[in-house]
């Protein structure tokens, strides 16, 4: 069974994510965003409600819709990661190679630096032979792979899991982390972008570039 190592990312999803805690400060909260490299037309709430069953879903969608408001109001304006950027947890601690065991995952972020966006990222670790050919081997290290946590369907956080898949709680999109975060269920039309990573000389996980595709909705 996959275990989630939680970081301090309170409020990131306005309570709709299973791995958000109540600790931390506002300055630690990641921002949900869309990427201008992806073309996304603004949608209204009526269309969102219709997609999940109509007005009877209003009460259950209060938290997801609050998060989606921020998706629509923000666009990507700079690099998410770049070569040499350290991966850190919600408290700003750099991630060591030994941080996760096989089958575990955690939410990480790029270490703060001027011009670098706050970008929630899913870090997972599996046995290297568990990954399919869809996973770029040059993007992974020591069984670690990293993917954007922003769902490619409507921009919610992919924060849940089910039978080894990563699940978005808003519309139940499912992604397989051992198959390049390919879509295996729900409405998303493309995989979560993968982040190229390696281990620094000091033993910490770092990025070797930016995500290999647009972050968030659109980009098809």
Curated annotation (Swiss-Prot):
Lineage top rank: taxon: Archaea
Binding residue positions for [2Fe-2S] cluster: 151, 153, 168, 171
One annotated GO biological process: nitrate assimilation
Its biological purpose: The respiratory membrane-bound nitrate reductase enzyme complex plays a role in generation of metabolic energy by using nitrate as a terminal electron acceptor during anaerobic conditions. Proposed Rieske subunit involved in a protonmotive Q-cycle mechanism-based electron transfer electrons to the beta subunit.
Gene Ontology CC terms: plasma membrane
Cell compartment(s), UniProt: Cell membrane
Presence of the UniProt keyword Transport in the record: yes
InterPro entries noted in UniProt: Rieske_2Fe-2S (IPR017941), Rieske_2Fe-2S_sf (IPR036922), Rieske_Fe-S_prot (IPR014349)
MF-aspect GO terms: 2 iron, 2 sulfur cluster binding; metal ion binding
Residues of the Rieske domain: 118-206
Subunit structure: Probable multiprotein complex; a catalytic heterodimer of an alpha and beta chain is proposed to associate with additional subunits involved in membrane attachment and electron transfer.
Disulfide bond entries: 156-170
Predominant subcellular localization, coarse grouping: membrane
Lineage start: Archaea, Methanobacteriati, Methanobacteriota, Stenosarchaea group, Halobacteria
The protein's required cofactors: [2Fe-2S] cluster
PANTHER family cross-referenced by the UniProt entry: CYTOCHROME B-C1 COMPLEX SUBUNIT RIESKE, MITOCHONDRIAL (PTHR10134)
Keywords of the record: 2Fe-2S, Cell membrane, Disulfide bond, Electron transport, Iron, Iron-sulfur, Membrane, Metal-binding, Nitrate assimilation, Plasmid, Transport
Cofactor note: Binds 1 [2Fe-2S] cluster per subunit.
Keyword Metal-binding: yes
Protein name: Putative respiratory nitrate reductase subunit Rieske
